[in-house]
Curated annotation (Swiss-Prot):
Gene Ontology terms: cellular component: adherens junction; apical plasma membrane; axon; beta-catenin-TCF complex; catenin complex; cytoplasm; cytosol; endocytic vesicle
Tissue: Isoform cytoplasmic accumulates at low levels in axons, at high levels in specific cells along the CNS midline and in leg and eye imaginal disks. Isoform neural accumulates in the axon tracts of the CNS. Both isoforms accumulate in the peripheral nervous system.
PANTHER family in UniProt: ARMADILLO SEGMENT POLARITY PROTEIN
Taxonomic classification: Eukaryota, Metazoa, Ecdysozoa, Arthropoda, Hexapoda
Organism: Drosophila melanogaster (Fruit fly)
InterPro entries: ARM-like (IPR011989), ARM-type_fold (IPR016024), Armadillo (IPR000225), Beta-catenin (IPR013284)
Entry membrane topology: Peripheral membrane protein
ARM repeat start and end residues: 159-200, 201-242, 243-284, 285-326, 327-368, 369-410, 411-449, 450-496, 497-538, 539-584, 585-608, 609-647, 648-689
Phosphoserine: modified positions: 688, 694
Stated name of the protein: Armadillo segment polarity protein
Chief location: cytoplasm
Quaternary structure, from the entry: Interacts with Mer and Moe at the adherens junction. Interacts with Inx2. Interacts with alpha-Cat. Interacts with Myo31DF.
GO terms, biological process: branch fusion, open tracheal system; branching morphogenesis of an epithelial tube; canonical Wnt signaling pathway; cell adhesion; cell elongation involved in imaginal disc-derived wing morphogenesis; cell fate determination; cell morphogenesis; cell-cell adhesion
Length: 843
């Protein structure tokens, strides 16, 4: 048919299309179909159910319709070139070759070559039903074939195993070698492999073969078979029960690479999956042989060896010591320096991480250059390698505080603080805390590379994650004291808006280890006068006083308990922190803050002076020293001096004049001197004599005296600067990750331990010879009323001369000439570490 012209289409009054004139004798259905083939293919949808659409206004056919076969004239069909006989012949041919088509699809290998089979596929992209069934049928065929072969292999191996066992036990090495190779070939197939591992006699024969044979080929074949068996749990158990581990360990000395590979991989599989293998390898001397193998240079082989070492050393102190005695740390560090194969570096770092918690291995790793070698990989793209290196560095860092040449590591750690990984930041902060402890060069380096800014940001971002805030605060505490850039660090904390965040850490829910670290940091920050006002405004003084009162109450409660129950518990602990440490820290921080007049007024308002006075009676000399120090600052104001005197401080202060602790005696003298400013002249004169007799003692060279004239208990208190002590168990522990049961160290807070008479200007109107001073025998100076008290006798002129004495005539001293210059800061002695701890604010 042809398209009908548009003008021939007429519209009736009922708004329906009238079909064009059609030839007679055409059914209604055919008329409808032909009507659909008009020039626009418009369809009301009534007859066909198609969606109604408006003909295109452009008069063009839709693009989608142009390629549709239905668009062609209905008269266009298959060419009528076949006769009925030909059609019948084709149908018969297709019917006769149906089985061949099925065979070609499912079993193509059964067809003879050259046979042509007519295809029923008209569209190459549309497979026939037979073709669609061919893939699963092929899979089924292969499964059946494999099952048949598996059964054949299993039967063959089962029949051959008894004979092969006899051959393996033969005395002729050639026979043994041939039998071992046959067994090795059988072990490559799964069915026969299961048959071998199910025969304990066969496995035992293989173990004997590798133990007794001197033939390399038979050894290689036998150990290769054991290697194949070790991929199955049943095979591992068979090897273990047959005593295969000692034989495999013996092969670790073989000069043949393939034998070594088979032996180490089999042992590795045993260590991973077979219970009891670790002890068996240790008893067979496997650790020593594996450490020796670390000298090889095949990275994949080394990766397996190091993983074996990690498995053996983890949780076993004896294994760690064996690795140390065999020279393991040096070889492991060499590997970290020499290779870039990620898996090898990762497995080696795991071994070092395990060894780094061993107090014996730790210094050996550090001495071998482990810190620098691990630092080389902090920029690696492998997160697991970086994490292991950081964990290991954290464990080693407390033993590396004196190591030189860590500038690159410190810079990398500061950069790592910006990571979004909590574990990475935790480790980096802990390492920085330890490496900046008692190391002025490291402190300066961290400050110069922006460490203070990074640590403040870390604390701000950490929120309530104490596993991050505690080491970060400790690191800041180290950076803000006792090095050339400490003042810059103190200012940098303020300029980076860190003061408010740090003070907030004194609030609950912070735990005592963190609070202790924050107290020390605030004390150091207070050394910068510019920080006094901001600290006060953020409530630092209020929180310090609150913590002091709580800790003081706990210590007093503990004392009462000891007195009433006879308990032997010497002090109160909270989260591993002694409350005496909190008392000393808070009082020391208030001492430095009290240098500013507004802070002194606020401290007086807190009604805390009575506690300071009571602390003068404390048996711990460091607490006596900080208490006397804060009273010395508060006594600078008349109001403070009056309150101190009203609280009865004169008596204990006078007693402390005779303390063997130079700092305590000097502060006590300074407080008494300031309290006497409005006293009568007679009182001042007696006080000056008492002070002179007390300060000019027979201890001529106390700074150079090794024991400082103190008992061993006090010298233990004046211990060196502590490294960061991690509180939480996340990550591998270091020596400093435990709080329980450690001795109480009297950390110094740098509270102006003034040399006796240093900065004490004493003038005399009468010139005279130098007078030494032995402690006077007199009693205390009078109390608030300025009354009695025996004045110490004037020492004889022949007494030894104190190095701190001035040229004076003691009998003619003008008390008004006494002037304590409390701003004078003596230099810590370089030859006395115990005494230098007074100046140690890092702990």
């Amino acid at each position: 048919m042809s398209y009908m012209p548009a003008q021939n289409r007429t519209m009736s009054h009922n708004n329906q299309y009238n079909p064009p004139d059609l030839p007679p004798m055409v059914s209604a259905k055919e008329q409808t179909l032909m009507w659909q083939q008009n020039s626009y293919l418009g369809d009301s949808g009534i007859h066909s159910g198609a969606v109604t659409q408006v003909p295109s206004l452009s008069g063009k056919e839709d693009e989608e319709m142009e390629g549709d076969p239905l668009m062609f004239d209905l008269d266009t069909g298959f060419p009528q070139n076949f006769t009925q006989d030909q059609v019948d012949d084709m149908n018969q041919q297709l019917s006769q070759t149906r089985s061949q088509r099925v065979r070609a699809a499912m079993f193509p290998e059964t067809l003879e070559e050259g046979i042509e089979i007519p295809s029923t596929q008209f569209d190459p992209q549309q497979p026939t039903a037979v073709q669609r069934l061919s893939e699963p049928s092929q899979m089924l065929k292969h499964a059946v074939v494999n099952l048949i072969n598996y059964q054949d292999d299993a039967e063959l191996a089962t029949r051959a195993i008894p004979e092969l066992i006899k051959l393996l036990n033969d005395e002729d090495q050639v026979v043994v070698s041939q039998a071992a190779m046959m067994v090795h070939q059988l072990s490559k197939k799964e069915a026969s492999r299961h048959a071998i591992m199910n025969s304990p006699q066969m496995v035992a024969a293989l173990v004997r073969a590798i133990s007794n044979s001197n033939d390399l080929e038979s050894t290689k074949a036998a150990v290769g078979t054991l290697h194949n068996l070790s991929h199955h749990r049943q095979g591992l158990l068979a090897i273990f029960k047959s005593g295969g581990i000692p034989a495999l360990v013996k092969l670790l000395s073989s000069p043949v690479e393939s034998v070594l590979f088979y032996a180490i991989t089999t042992l590795h599989n045993l260590l991973l999956h077979q219970d009891g293998s670790k002890m068996a390898v240790r008893l067979a001397g496997g650790l020593q042989k594996m450490v020796t193998l670390l000298q090889r240079n095949n990275v994949k082989f080394l990766a397996i060896v190091t993983d074996c070492l990690q498995i053996l050393a983890y949780g076993n102190q004896e294994s760690k010591l064996i690795i140390l005695a065999s020279g393991g740390p040096n070889e492991l560090v060499r590997i970290m320096r020499s290779y870039d194969y990620e898996k090898l570096l990762w497995t080696t770092s795991r071994v070092l991480k395990v060894l780094s918690v061993c107090s014996s291995n730790k210094p050996a790793i550090v001495d071998a250059g482990g810190m620098q070698a691990l630092a080389m990989h902090l920029g690696n793209m492998s997160p697991r390698l970086v994490q292991n290196c950081l964990w290991t560095l954290r464990n080693l860092s407390d033993a590396a505080t004196k190591v030189e040449g860590l500038e690159a590591l410190l810079q990398s750690l500061v950069q790592v603080l910006g990571s979004t990984d909590v574990n990475v930041v935790t480790c980096a902060a802990g390492i920085l805390s330890n490496l900046t402890c008692n190391n002025q060069r490291n402190k300066a380096t961290v400050c110069q590379v922006g460490g203070v800014d990074a640590l403040v940001r870390t604390i701000i971002n950490a929120g309530d994650r104490e596993e991050i805030t505690e080491p970060a605060v400790c690191a800041l505490r180290h950076l803000t004291s006792r090095h050339v850039d400490s003042e810059l660090a103190q200012n940098a904390v303020r300029l980076n808006y860190g003061l408010s965040v740090i003070v907030k850490l004194l609030h609950p829910p912070s735990r005592w280890p963190l609070i202790k670290a924050v107290i020390g940091l605030i004390r150091n920050l207070a050394l910068c006068p510019a920080n006094h006002a901001p600290l006060r405004e953020h409530g630092a003084i209020h929180h310090l006083v609150r913590l002091l009162m709580r800790a003081f109450q706990d210590t007093e409660r503990q004392r009462s308990s000891i007195a009433t129950t006879g308990s032997q518990q010497p002090s109160a602990y909270a989260d591993g922190v002694r409350m005496e440490e909190i008392v000393e820290g808070t009082v020391g921080a208030l001492h430095i803050l009290a240098r500013e007049s507004h802070n002194r007024a606020l401290i007086r308002q807190q009604s805390v002076i009575p506690i300071f006075v009571r602390l003068l009676f404390n048996e711990i000399e460091n607490i006596q020293r900080v208490a006397a120090g804060v009273l010395c600052e508060l006594a600078a104001d008349k109001e403070g001096a009056e309150i101190i005197e009203q609280e009865g401080a004169t008596g204990p202060l006078t007693d402390l004049l005779h303390s063997r602790n130079e700092g305590v005696a000097t502060y006590a003298a300074a407080v008494l001197f300031r309290m006497s400013e409005d006293k009568p002249q007679d009182y001042k004169k007696r006080l000056s004599i008492e002070l002179t007799n007390s300060l000019l003692r027979e201890d001529n060279n106390i700074w150079a005296n090794a024991d400082l004239g103190m008992g061993p208990d006090l010298q233990d208190m004046l211990g060196p600067e502590e490294a960061y002590e991690g509180l939480y168990g996340q990550g591998p522990p270091s020596v400093h990750s435990s709080h329980g049961g450690r001795a109480f160290h009297q950390q110094g807070y740098d509270t102006l331990p003034i040399d006796s008479m240093q900065g004490l200007e004493i003038s005399s109107p009468v010139g005279g010879g130098g007078a030494g001073g032995a402690p006077g025998n007199g009693g205390a100076v009078g109390g608030a009323s300025g009354g009695g008290g025996n004045i110490g006798a004037i020492p004889p002129s022949g007494a030894p001369t104190s190095p701190y004495s001035m040229d004076m005539d003691v009998g003619e001293i003008d008390a008004g000439a006494l002037n304590f210059d409390l701003d004078a800061m003596p230099t810590p002695p370089n030859d006395n570490n115990n005494l230098a701890a007074w100046y140690d604010t890092d702990c």
